[in-house]
A protein has these predicted regions:
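Periplasmic/extracellular, small/polar-rich flexible segments of pilin-like filament-forming proteins
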Residues: 59-144
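Hydrophobic transmembrane signal anchors and adjacent membrane-proximal interface regions, especially
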Residues: 23, 39, 48, 108-109, ...
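Context-gated lysine
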Residues: 6, 32, 37-39, 82, ...
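Short alpha-helix boundary/capping motifs
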Residues: 1-3, 59-60
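Conserved hydrophobic/amphipathic alpha-helical signal-anchor segments
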Residues: 33-75
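N-terminal single-pass transmembrane signal-anchor helix
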Residues: 2-35, 42, 46, 50
Length: 144
């Protein structure tokens, strides 16, 4: 009577390992990108707080504010610097908000890079904000 072997052949095991390798090669870079985007959310939320303060300042009839340091942003616009912990440098010039992300806080891909919010006054009195960056990879610049 022939005894039948149970288990996987070497080819089957190699195919499974290859499939796992392909999935890992796709998933790991996507995970890294999403992790960076999640950490950047803290920066964009802090900048959005400043944008709200800039919009309120403008709509009170004061014109576009200018504050060239985080301390001035906090004192003149009333924005807490706790929300700006990952931002190394922050300034507002005629309503345009410019932030430089702190070194060694998120990832070398975005650390020390500049993120800019540019306001546009609409005819109905609302303000539309546009995000941009000259040195940050486009995948990390907010779309909204």
């Amino acid at each position: 009577m022939l005894r039948r072997e149970k288990g996987f052949t070497l080819i089957e095991l190699l195919i499974v390992i290859a499939i796992i390798g392909i999935l890992a090669a796709i998933a790991i870079p996507m995970y890294k990108t999403q992790t960076i985007k999640a950490k950047l959310t803290e920066v964009t939320n802090g900048m959005s707080n400043v944008a709200s303060a800039v919009a309120a300042y403008m709509q009170e009839g004061n014109g576009w504010p200018t504050a060239n340091s985080q301390d001035l942003v906090q004192s003149s616009l009333g924005v807490s610097t706790k929300a700006l912990s990952r931002i190394g440098s922050l300034g507002v010039n005629n309503g345009v908000i410019t932030a430089i992300i702190s070194a060694n806080t998120i990832d070398p891909t975005v650390d020390n890079k500049t993120l800019v919010m540019v306001p546009t006054s609409n005819t109905d009195g609302s303000i539309t904000w546009t995000w941009s960056s000259s040195d940050m990879p486009p995948a990390y610049v907010p779309k909204r």
